[in-house]
C-alpha cells in the first residue's frame, strides 16, 4: 500500500472548549439537547484545537495500477482547507445561497461540503455528471436547488462544464475547482455566525418512489441526529472510527463523515465503484480499523448480499472483524442477506450482534430507529392477506401466507413516532398498518421550494391520539 500522509500541527488554546462530551448534549431528563453554539463547524474547530495532528479522513484510492493508495488529512489541515475553499465560495455566493457539490468521491468532496457550510451557504451534496445512470436525478435536483455556485475537482471539471453548458445562461452558476484553491486563500475568509435553526444543507431524496425533492436539513437537525445515532448504536467510546464506501451525496454516506466531527476520530472512505468491483475491499478496510478499536460502517441490504457472495476471502487471509458494528438499512432488509453475511464472516470474528437493522429517511436527517446494541437481528412473520387489509397479524414462519419482516428496533432517543391512518390522521392501535409520523429536533424544516408539500408532510398533526397505557 502506497501511503501519502500530510502532517498538520495543532495549536491548543486554553479558552477554547475541549472535545464534545455526549453527556453535555443531554438535559436533566436524558433528552438530546444540543448545547448553545454546537454545530458541525464548531465541532470541527474543537477537533482542530484538541486533536489537530490526528487523522480526520482517509481516502483509499483504488484507481491506480500499483494497488491501493491511502491519502489522509488531519484536522488541522482540514481546517486550513475549509478556510481557503470557504473564502473562494464567499467570493461567488452569499449567505443562504445554495452551493452544489458536483465532485467525485474523495477528500475534496468532504472539504467542499464542510467549506460550503462554514461559509454560511447551503450545501447541496450531489455528484459529478460523469456518474452514469443518474442524469435525470441530477437535472431535477439542480433545477430545484438553483445553486449560485458549484464545487468540483480538476478531474471532473470537463463533465461539469458540459453539464452546465446545457443550462440557460441565466441559470449558470460560478464554478470553484476545489483542488486548485490555494491554502493562502484562507486569509480572505470572513467568519460567519451559524444560526442553529438555519439550513445546513439540502438532502435530496433517493427518487425511488417519487421524483427527488430537497429536504431542508438544519444545523440543529444534523447535530441532534448524529447524537441520536451515537447513543442508539452505543458508539460512546472515543476510540471509534468509521469506514464507508457509500456515496457522499446519500444521506447515510453523509452521516459517515459527520461522526468524526462529533467524537474527534476519523473515517476511512472508499469509492462506491471500488466496493462494487471488489467487495472484499470493504472487509479489508474494516479489518484494518478493527485492530485499533471499534469501527462502524453502514450499507444497504444489497451490499451484504453482494459481499457474502463476491467478497469471500481465502482462509489464510488475516482478517479480524471483532470490533465491527454494521448498520443495514436504506432499503428493505432481508434476513437472508444478514444470515449469508454472518455465515461468511462470523469465523472472522464478526459478533452475532454486530449487524444492526435500521430505519431512516431523509426527512428525519437520516436516522430513525435501530436494534439495541446487545440484540441480534430478528425476524417476525405477518399474514399476507391481513396486511392487505392494513392489519399486522403474526403467523408462524412456515405459514403459507407468511411475509417476513426484519425488526428495525427502537426509535432513537428524543424522537417520537406514531402510526397514523393517513385518511383520518388518527393514531392507530397496535397491530395496525398505517403511516409513520415522526417528531423531534432531527426532523428537517421542509421541502425546498415546495410549500404545499411541506405543509402536508411537515406540519401535519394527528386528529386524535390513543390514551397512553
Regions found by a protein language model. Give the residues of each.
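Conserved AMP-binding/adenylation subdomain of ANL enzymes
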Residues: 223-241, 250-295, 310
Amino acid at each position: 500500500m502506497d501511503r501519502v500522509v500530510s502532517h498538520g500541527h495543532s495549536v491548543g488554546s486554553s479558552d477554547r472548549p475541549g472535545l464534545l462530551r455526549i453527556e453535555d448534549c443531554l438535559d436533566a431528563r436524558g433528552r438530546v439537547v444540543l448545547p448553545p453554539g454546537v454545530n458541525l463547524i464548531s465541532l470541527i474547530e474543537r477537533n482542530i484545537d484538541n486533536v489537530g495532528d490526528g487523522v480526520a479522513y482517509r481516502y483509499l484510492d483504488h484507481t491506480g495500477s500499483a494497488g491501493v493508495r491511502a491519502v489522509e488529512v488531519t484536522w488541522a489541515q482540514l481546517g486550513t482547507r475549509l478556510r481557503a475553499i470557504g473564502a473562494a465560495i464567499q467570493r461567488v455566493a452569499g449567505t443562504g445561497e445554495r452551493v452544489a457539490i458536483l465532485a467525485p468521491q474523495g477528500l475534496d468532496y468532504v472539504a467542499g461540503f464542510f467549506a460550503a457550510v462554514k461559509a454560511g451557504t447551503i450545501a447541496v451534496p450531489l455528484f459529478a455528471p460523469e456518474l452514469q445512470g443518474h442524469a435525470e436525478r441530477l437535472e431535477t435536483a439542480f433545477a430545484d436547488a438553483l445553486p449560485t455556485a458549484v464545487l468540483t475537482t480538476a478531474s471532473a471539471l470537463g463533465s461539469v462544464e458540459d453539464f452546465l453548458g446545457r443550462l440557460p445562461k441565466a441559470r449558470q452558476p460560478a464554478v470553484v475547482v476545489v483542488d486548485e484553491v490555494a491554502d493562502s486563500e484562507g486569509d480572505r475568509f470572513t467568519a460567519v455566525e451559524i444560526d442553529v435553526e438555519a439550513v445546513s444543507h439540502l438532502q435530496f431524496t433517493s427518487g425511488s418512489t417519487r421524483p427527488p425533492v430537497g429536504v431542508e436539513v438544519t444545523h440543529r437537525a444534523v447535530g441532534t441526529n448524529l447524537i441520536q445515532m451515537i447513543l442508539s448504536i452505543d458508539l460512546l467510546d472515543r476510540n471509534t472510527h468509521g469506514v464507508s464506501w457509500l456515496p457522499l451525496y446519500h444521506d447515510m454516506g453523509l452521516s459517515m463523515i459527520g461522526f468524526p466531527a462529533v467524537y474527534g476520530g476519523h473515517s476511512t472512505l472508499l469509492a462506491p465503484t471500488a466496493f462494487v468491483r471488489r467487495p472484499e475491499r470493504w472487509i479489508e478496510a474494516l479489518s484494518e480499523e478493527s485492530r485499533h478499536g471499534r469501527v462502524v460502517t453502514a450499507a444497504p441490504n444489497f451490499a451484504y448480499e453482494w459481499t457474502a457472495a463476491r467478497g469471500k476471502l481465502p482462509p489464510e487471509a488475516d482478517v479480524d472483524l471483532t470490533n465491527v458494528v454494521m448498520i443495514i438499512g436504506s432499503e428493505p432488509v432481508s434476513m437472508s442477506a444478514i444470515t449469508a453475511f454472518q455465515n461468511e464472516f462470523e469465523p472472522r470474528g464478526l459478533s452475532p450482534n454486530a449487524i444492526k437493522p435500521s430505519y431512516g429517511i431523509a426527512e428525519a436527517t437520516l436516522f430513525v430507529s435501530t436494534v439495541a446494541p446487545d440484540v441480534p437481528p430478528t425476524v417476525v412473520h405477518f399474514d399476507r392477506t391481513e396486511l392487505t387489509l392494513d392489519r399486522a397479524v403474526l403467523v408462524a414462519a412456515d405459514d403459507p401466507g407468511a411475509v417476513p419482516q426484519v425488526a428495525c428496533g427502537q426509535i432513537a432517543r428524543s424522537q417520537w413516532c406514531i402510526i397514523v391512518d393517513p385518511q383520518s390522521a388518527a393514531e392507530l392501535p397496535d397491530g395496525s398498518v398505517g403511516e409513520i409520523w415522526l417528531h423531534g429536533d432531527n426532523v428537517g424544516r421542509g421541502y425546498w421550494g415546495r410549500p404545499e408539500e411541506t405543509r402536508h408532510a411537515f406540519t401535519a398533526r394527528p386528529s386524535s391520539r390513543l390514551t397512553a397505557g
